[in-house]
Amino acid sequence: MQFKYLVPMLALAVASPALALDDVTVALAIPAAVHDGAPYAAAEELGLFKEQGLSVSFVVFQGAGALLPQVASKRVTFGYPVSEPVISSYFSGKDPLPLRYFYNGTPSQTLEYTVLEESPIRTLADLKDRKIGVGALTWGTIPNSRAALRVAGLEPGKNVEFVAVGVLGSGFQALRSGQVDALNYNSSWGDIFELTGTKIRRIAYPEVFLENPGNGFIAHEDTFRDNPDLIRRFGRAYTQAQYVCEINPTFCVQAFWRQNPESRPADAEGKGLENATTLLTRRLQRMLYRPDGTRRQPGEYDLDVIRKAIGAMAEAGEFPSADVPVDRIFSNEFVPAFDDFDKDALRQRAEAAQ
């Protein structure tokens, strides 16, 4: 799906003459699909952004490396990148990026290594002398992927190789055809692969990385200082949208398709709808709940987990040291505001939505 279809959809929240809305542009590193784009669509259709005084549009840049300068220069309001490039900026010898994360969008490790079920590869160590497919060699996730392999005793570039295979279908075909021995995609893409009928085996990252956050919403430090309420309102609307999609995933999927008709599958009332709601529900389960079933605090960062992961990255040679100001990069300042809304009233709206 080309994300250009999503941009005009999310730009429909136009300020009325009676109510001026604050324009917010959010930069993504990859196009949204139904499993991660449905909450945005739900927020638009139910007027959640508008109720928070926001007119939200989305743009896509090719990876975190292209996205981050847009936020740093204030050409966009918020971004949704992985954190490794931001952390790395503290080791550049120059001024670090003037950016801070304010919302933990993926509070557990979403990346995994995927092999075909019949593959002899069962552990990370088994990837020795193998080829691993990634979307592009510029992905901001690759430092963490390399670190995971080093923790398992491998040496990327010497006895294991990353290969660019593109995303989704092209990568799936690369694995099926034997062009690569494994894929390094996120878990939702693994779900999509399974729903094509292919039996796969998933290999998790080392434990130190399992609760390390992935993508999150980030803003310029000036926005924290000059317009903190903008952050609160956006984070609240996004939290509300995830809540709606947990209650009524069918509505959220169909909202995404209505606003992105090119993404609508042929069997949108049958198997296509079932698969899409499965993808969305699985993702929300991972994002909203811990492995033990307890509910996460929306948007919150576990700074101790992050410090341990940075330490492991440093030991693996991906960072020159673990000496970074974690509490400056990742902020929980606005977390109490994100779920400050009438959940019973929103549940009623979600259940009635069609």
Explain the meaning of each model-derived region.
Residues 1-7:
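Bacterial N-terminal signal peptides that target proteins for export
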Residues 15-17:
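N-terminal signal peptide c-region/cleavage motif recognized by signal peptidases
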Residues 21-177, 181-187, 198, 203, ...:
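Short, glycine-/small- and polar/acidic-enriched structural segments
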Residues 169-270:
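Pocket-lining segment of extracytoplasmic ligand-binding domains
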Residues 303-354:
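Conserved C-terminal helix/tail region of periplasmic/extracytoplasmic solute-binding proteins
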Residues 227-320:
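Secondary-structure end/capping motifs
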Residues 8-12:
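Hydrophobic helical h-region of N-terminal Sec-dependent signal peptides
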Residues 57, 161-163, 270-279, 324-336:
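Short linear loop/turn motifs
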